[in-house]
Curated annotation (Swiss-Prot):
UniProt motif 'HIGH' region: location: 133-143
Protein's organism: Dehalococcoides mccartyi (strain ATCC BAA-2100 / JCM 16839 / KCTC 5957 / BAV1)
PANTHER family, sorted: ARGININE--TRNA LIGASE, CYTOPLASMIC (PTHR11956:SF5), ARGINYL-TRNA SYNTHETASE (PTHR11956)
Compartments (UniProt record): Cytoplasm
Official protein name in the record: Arginine--tRNA ligase
Family: Belongs to the class-I aminoacyl-tRNA synthetase family.
Enzyme class, first EC level, given as a word: ligase
Gene Ontology terms describing biological process: arginyl-tRNA aminoacylation
Lineage: Bacteria, Bacillati, Chloroflexota, Dehalococcoidia, Dehalococcoidales
Keyword Repressor attached: no
Length: 556
């Protein structure tokens, strides 16, 4: 009975049973309703509350307060609940027992690094595809936000009992790759003193000049000694591989790694594109008109049909999407697929659902998360260009300036659908104003207390947590209790910003406890009990930081 989710289920079940008893007693009619509970903003209203009486008042013909009192009269305390009360205008409140709260400290110390894990997923296979930037240039902070969203959701879903694979889809086919190769070959020739023009549709950033210089340093004029078309292709392949290495390095600096780097080309060379097209054709979702091949997505409720193969015979991006999702769902047998895309892909979502359905797959198994972009600021001023290059600021530059932990926290700090400002100056402040510093300082403060206890040779292993009873102590335990619930919420909603809010609330609860309660004192028994609480706080805060992909510093 040591999980808050178990307590939550007991509360919901007790409300359901109270409704049934009230019905049997003729006090309310038979009703079907979803029962929901939440944490009140103020703990003097209890630890859980429900507005069920307010929702049932009209159907029962009773005033909400009267209905609340009727239902509460059928609910017994126990199983971690010490008090059931009613409050205007019609709430039923539930309060955790002190005994349950104190016992939770022992549970946390026992579970240690696995505290917060739940078995929501039951081993279900989930694939999360994110970043998937074109290998034609450096990644920027928009890619960084998507990267942190993806890796954090992966951490959370693993903690919730899912099997998760993280994947980067390499867009190594199509016109952008051809433009990249033509650009690099032109820059390579220029670096060797030859007259060559960068194509108008090419890549004009300084990074291409630098990449060409790197090729000259490594290969000299080797690629001038062969036919131009072969040289352009071969050099372009090397350049693209190098760009992918740079992208990978930047992501690793952000503490983002992938299980799979999946090549778009392999969909064609491996026959998956043809197989997927055969399925769509067999299901009558392929049409030929205007010398092009179309996916009849309007048959599935989309606003328009979509071209799969252009009139010149080249596949569209959507053609690759079809083959890729055939590969994900049918060949690799993922139970659920999550795509994390920038908000500029909004128009693609409905056709993706239609395509998956046309392949014979339940479209509910595909989730596309769209995230808004980031506005970079320094104090109150917009940061548009890099001071170093005069071009759009890269993700690497931001990481180098403020650190990976600050990047990850701020990228997570708002819901995906919210645009966000990232203040570089705030991210570097060593004060409570900076939420990253505030949260990590709480962990460092915890570690300093435990180090002091070690220096004093205090053995708190036999400490009795039943001695804990100060309001600040119990508030801290209440907040620690919520971690499994946060894992469940984020796994269900796919909204990892809840983690940043929770981390700040947990840090605040610890700082308040530290202010109100002297940990190491002349009272040996109370000292041991509080040291146990401090150690449990360390575990929960470190676990929260880990789920966000951040470090837990022992000193600051």
């Amino acid at each position: 009975m040591n999980s808050i989710l178990a307590i939550k289920n007991i509360v919901i079940e007790s409300l359901s049973q109270a409704m049934e008893k009230a019905r049997q007693e003729g006090q309310i009619p038979a009703l079907s309703v979803d029962i929901s509970i939440e944490h009140p903003q103020k703990t003097n209203y209890g630890d859980y509350a429900t507005s069920l009486p307010l929702r049932l008042a009209k159907a029962t013909g009773k005033r909400p307060m009267e209905l609340a009192q009727i239902l509460a009269s059928y609910i017994e305390t126990g199983s971690g609940i010490s008090k059931v009360s009613v409050a205007p205008p019609g709430f039923i409140n539930f309060t955790f027992s002190k005994e349950w709260l104190c016992s939770l400290v022992k549970t946390i110390l026992t579970e240690a690094g696995s505290y917060g894990n739940i078995n929501m997923g039951g081993g279900s296979r989930v694939q999360i595809e994110f970043v998937s930037a074109n290998p034609t240039g450096p990644i920027h902070i928009g890619h960084g936000r998507g990267a942190v969203l993806g890796s954090t959701l992966s951490n959370i879903l693993k903690a919730a009992g899912y099997y998760v694979e993280e994947e980067f889809y390499i867009n190594d086919a199509g016109s952008q790759i051809d433009a990249f190769k033509r650009t690099l070959f032109a820059r390579y020739q220029q670096a060797l003193g030859k007259d060559a023009a960068v194509p108008q549709d090419g890549y004009h950033g300084q990074y291409m000049v630098d990449l060409a210089a790197e090729m000259v340093t490594k290969y000299g004029d080797k690629y001038l000694q062969m036919p131009a078309d072969i040289a352009q292709n071969d050099l372009g392949e090397i350049g693209m591989a190098r760009m992918l290495c740079l992208i990978s390095d930047d992501l690793k600096a952000l503490k983002v790694d992938f299980d799979i780097w999946f090549s778009e080309r392999s969909l064609y060379s491996g026959g998956q594109y043809k197989t997927a097209m055969d399925i769509l054709s067999g299901n009558n979702y392929i049409a030929e008109r205007d010398n092009a091949t179309w996916f009849s997505s309007t048959l599935l409720g989309d606003s328009k049909d979509n071209v799969i193969v252009r009139s010149d015979g080249t596949p569209t991006y959507f053609a690759s999407d079809i083959a890729y999702h055939y590969n994900k769902f049918i060949e690799r047998k993922f139970d659920r697929v999550i795509n994390i895309w920038g908000a500029d892909h909004q128009g693609h979502v409905s056709r993706m659902k239609a395509m998956v359905s046309a392949l014979g797959i339940n479209p509910e198994r595909l989730t596309t998360l769209l995230f808004q972009m980031i506005t970079l600021k320094r104090g109150g001023e917009l940061v548009r260009l890099s001071k170093r290059t005069g071009e759009i600021i890269s993700l690497r530059e931001v990481i180098e300036e403020v650190g990976a932990d600050a990047c990850r926290f701020f990228f997570l700090a708002r819901s995906t659908e919210s645009q966000m400002d990232f203040d570089l100056e705030l991210a570097k402040k060593e004060s409570a104003e900076n939420p990253v510093y505030y949260v990590q300082y709480a962990h460092a403060r915890i570690c300093s207390i435990l180090h002091l206890a070690e220096e004093k040779q205090l053995d708190y292993s036999t400490g009795d947590t039943a001695l804990l009873g100060e309001e600040a102590e119990l508030e801290l335990i209440r907040k620690m209790a919520e971690l499994p619930e946060i894992v469940e919420t984020v796994s269900r909603t796919l909204e990892p910003h809840h983690l940043t809010y929770y981390a700040q609330e947990l840090a605040n609860a610890f700082h308040q406890f530290y202010k109100d309660c002297r940990v190491i004192s002349d009272n040996a028994e109370l000292t041991c009990a509080r040291l146990k609480l401090v150690d449990a706080s360390r575990i929960v805060l470190a676990r929260t930081l880990h789920l966000m992909g951040m470090t837990s510093p022992e000193s600051m």
